Amino acid sequence: EYGLAQVSMNLTNMHLTSLHRAFESCRKSAEQRGLLVTGSELVGLIPKKALVEAGKYFLQKQNRSTGVSEQEIIHIAVQSLGLNSLQPFDPQTRIIEYMLEENNKELVSMSLEKFVRETSSESPAPGGGSVSAYAGALGAALGCMVANLTAHKKGYENQLDFFSGIAEQAQQKINELLFLVDEDTRAFNSILEALRMPKQTVEEKKARKKALRSANKKAIEVPYQTMKVAASCLDFILQMVEKGNPNSVSDAGVGALCIETAVRGAGLNVHINSAGLEDEEKKKYYLEKASKLESKTIQTVGKIIDNVKMKMSVHP
């Protein structure tokens, strides 16, 4: 059809023979015969993991950091495998997980401007909880950026694996915090749904009370999770301040401040939502945990910012 030789394969076990391994084997075999692999074609759907592994393989082969977004990794795989060579390859319609994925990313799929406008509207959601989670994601992203910038900077070649590992860790935190952006709004909406439940009969009152109890508990657990995930980012942000590219130290500092905003903002949501929790023991548990985590975060960020200022005075 295309006037080219073709190698057809059915990969039945990608744990044994990965997509990129099969492609590379064909490429090497063709090279031995003086031929050039011009691209490849995928028939049907493919698991996301196969393309992610391929993308990371080619990034490592290029001595590039693998701590980039999933979308970028898949883009690298598609380009390196030549999956666009015969016809456009659309990951949204060719990757199994993307085809099955429910449309639950209502806020994180918005543009920056639309998210801001939506927040500014008269609707109570998204509110402080979602904004706190997003601030945390931005903080993690800045730490990730410093890691990736340093990984490819002259003089840091021998530390590629270290900075790439930090960037991968940061990407995972970004994913968790972006999920919590929408999860916080879903938690708030579950309270509204419970409040709208009928309460005429005894059975209806019991069902409504049970739903409210569950919704209130979730409305505390979600921002508390935001606090924990955001606070955990300070470890790698501190490492980027100490070991990263000195020219990017201010970016790491801004990342730390974003994390503090995320933790303290989510902490406010834990406090205000705890008012609806009837279980006094659980209320005390969450309030104490949140207070300790907030205090530790403020202290850690203070040290990071002092470190940043010191680095900037040494490297004007």
What are the residue ranges of the model-derived segments?
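Long, contiguous binding/interaction regions
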Residues: 1-113, 121, 207, 211-214
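Flexible, glycine/charged-enriched surface loops at secondary-structure junctions
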Residues: 1-2, 32-46, 50, 157-158, ...
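Conserved phosphate/anionic-ligand binding catalytic regions in large, soluble enzymes, centered on
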Residues: 11-13, 119-146, 247-266
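Polytopic transmembrane helical bundles with strong interfacial aromatic enrichment
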Residues: 102-117, 225, 232, 273
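Non-transmembrane, amphipathic alpha-helical segments
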Residues: 107, 123-134, 158, 162, ...
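A structural-propensity feature for long, helix-poor, extended segments
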Residues: 152-198, 293-294, 299-301
